[in-house]
Design a protein with these regions (language model features):
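N-terminal topogenic membrane-targeting module
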Residues: 2-61, 69
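Exposed beta-sheet edge and beta->alpha loop/turn motif
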Residues: 66-95
Length: 125
């Protein structure tokens, strides 16, 4: 009973909670992003995390490299670049003491650049 009461009043540590569930969160992000249908004409086939996550108030971002395969009817089967791994930034949200993801994938920016943009939005600038 005492342990349960303590858990109600303990101060959350979002970065530690993220790291404890990092593999699970990344797998959820990949499944969700892959089901989005974007980029059009490509199927998500795998990913490899890059570096360490970056944290801000209520969010985390993490770099990854994603591998794609052209879909049979997507018109990209003859495009060699369609099979090249692409860097991406995975975005996560921390709300109600829980980490989640909507599968948001940011292309053409680094994790540091996305974190800077997220900090600007959080600060109202």
């Amino acid at each position: 009973m005492l342990t349960w009461l303590r858990s109600l009043f303990r101060r959350p540590d979002p970065p530690a909670e993220f790291r404890a569930k990092q593999a699970e969160l990344l797998a959820l992000w990949f499944r969700t992003a892959a089901s989005s249908g974007k980029p059009r004409g490509l199927t998500w086939v795998g990913f490899e995390p890059l570096g360490e996550p970056l944290f801000g108030p209520g969010w985390a971002v993490m770099g990854a490299v994603v591998q794609f395969e052209p879909t049979p009817d997507g018109g990209l089967a003859d495009v060699p670049q369609a099979r090249e791994p692409r860097p991406v930034v995975a975005v996560f949200a921390y709300t109600r003491r829980r980490w989640s993801t909507g599968g948001r994938a940011v292309f053409n920016l680094t994790a540091e650049q996305v974190a800077k943009q997220m900090n600007r939005k959080a600060g109202g600038a």
